Amino acid sequence: TRSLFHKEYAAENRSIENDLEAVSFLLTDCQLIIKNFDTFFLPDNEAITSFLRGANPERIAWISPDHSSVNQEGELLDRNGIPVSFHRESSSKIQIRSAGKDRVMWTSDDVVYPDRKTLSKAN
């Protein structure tokens, strides 16, 4: 059976914001299930995606090996085919960024999760 992530990530009826939120939920699951998650060296997209595909102590694959949004380099792609950017802000907080419709990272149309609106709702 396919996971909910497999069915919904980059699906036509969802948005980039939904996709990034789904990735954030997977990372939260990792933090809850994998002992000492904060000690793992996960510096980039490839390392994080590998971890989410089962290269972790529990061998849990949150992202299936054949997911269409993972490229040959093992990077998770956004719905525009651009590798997602992960920025580990602390031991428990990872910011996730999509290049947006212009397909260029670090421009004004990038989609970031959590964004300032999400953070202000939480406070």
Segments from the language model and where they lie:
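Amphipathic alpha-helical segments typified by the pilin-like N-terminal helix
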Residues: T1-N18
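Low-complexity, acidic interaction segments enriched in glycine
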Residues: R14, N18-N123
